[in-house]
Amino acid sequence: MQSLISFAHSRLSWGILALSALALESAALYFQHIMKLDPCVMCIYQRVAVFGLLGAGLFGFMAPANRVIRALGALLWGISAAWGLKLALELVDMQNNPNPFSTCSFLPEFPSWLQLHEWLPSVFMPTGMCTDIPWEFAGVTMGEWMIVAFSVYLLAWLAFIVPMLKKSA
């Protein structure tokens, strides 16, 4: 348990969180801009959740020895992973059970003080439809891969939450 506590209090653990989220964001932008796969509004919301994971990793990386910083990073990590998983599950449900009367919106519904799609449209403007499945790998859709990714983040958070919040030795 002590080695898990030491790892949870290290820059390495928070760096892995940040770098893995950065890799996911990079892949999303590659799919969008290089492969020309249009992201839907649910994809954009998941992208925001991944940015939350990136932010949590960077936040914890700044001062991993500080218990308050770790707690705030852990809070952002848990919220982002759970919210992302919820969104990925909803997207896969929309894709597997399309309903012409229940579609996703064309524009994201960000708060008025956080209009990401207007500030950075190349990253946050949805241009695709939620029911489209433009890409699969090993017979698994992108939405299903995101369920896997967010589940891993959530399971890692569950494994690390107690060691993260323990006092440093």
UniProtKB/Swiss-Prot annotation:
Residue intervals on the Periplasmic side: 31-48, 90-144
Transmembrane segment boundaries: 14-30, 49-64, 72-89, 145-163
Subcellular location: Cell inner membrane
Keywords per UniProt: Cell inner membrane, Cell membrane, Chaperone, Disulfide bond, Electron transport, Membrane, Oxidoreductase, Redox-active center, Transmembrane, Transmembrane helix, Transport
Topology of the protein relative to the lipid bilayer: Multi-pass membrane protein
Cited Gene3D superfamilies: DsbB-like
The organism's place on the tree of life at top rank: Bacteria
Cytoplasmic compartment segments: 1-13, 65-71, 164-169
Translocase is among the record's keywords: no
InterPro entries (UniProt xref): DiS_bond_form_DsbB/BdbC, Disulphide_bond_form_DsbB, DsbB, DsbB-like_sf
Disulphide-bonded residues: 40-43, 104-130
Main location: membrane
GO annotations of cellular component type: plasma membrane
Signal peptide region: none
One GO process term, biological-process aspect: protein folding
Keyword Electron transport: yes
Molecular function, one GO term: protein-disulfide reductase activity
UniProt function note: Required for disulfide bond formation in some periplasmic proteins. Acts by oxidizing the DsbA protein.
Family: Belongs to the DsbB family.
Protein name from the UniProt record: Disulfide bond formation protein B
Organism encoding this protein: Shewanella amazonensis (strain ATCC BAA-1098 / SB2B)
